[in-house]
Amino acid sequence: MRTVEEDIKSWAIDHVEKHGDKFPICPYAKKARLENQVKIVIVDKCDEFLERVCEEAGGLFQNRLKLIILACSEMEITPDTLNDYIHALNHVYVPLNTYLMASYPEDEQEEFMEGDWEPDNEFFMVLIQPFKELEDASAHLEKIGYYNNWSQEYYADTVLKRQSYRRIYGKRNEKTCKEENYEKRHKESKQKDQ
């Protein structure tokens, strides 16, 4: 029997990277894995999971990663609760260019994602990725027809949901710049008056 980490690696190689009709489930997964830009973190206790998500989300760019996958097999959180937490955390992290996405065993699979692969373990995951890079890649995939076989519901639950965070992307940085510029102008103004 595989460990949870081995399940995730097998899922990536044997399922996510495999070509479907035209494209693999994630066209960028193999390159990121081969370039060691993917980190897998196994959290043993559910009550430590969200704290660990925050730690890893805060360190995404320090480690120059394309993807961090956190997983927990202690199934003491419901899919709705996990999704609510991740939605709230995205309001904190998307302005910092970091996007979080929850995945739960009970999530419905789209037809194009179905395959023979099965995990040995039951676990839920949170995937952490750079928001801007994900948006740019998604725009490219849109142009080449990648999403054409997706159902409207799945497209809305993934792509449109992520796009809904665009309005807050960069806001924290804009506010900081405005505050710094105000302080700089205020300081210069005081110096001129003296």
Q: Residue spans of the language-model regions?
A:
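Expand to "…catalyze enediolate/carbanion chemistry for C-C bond making/breaking, isomerization
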Residues: 1-194
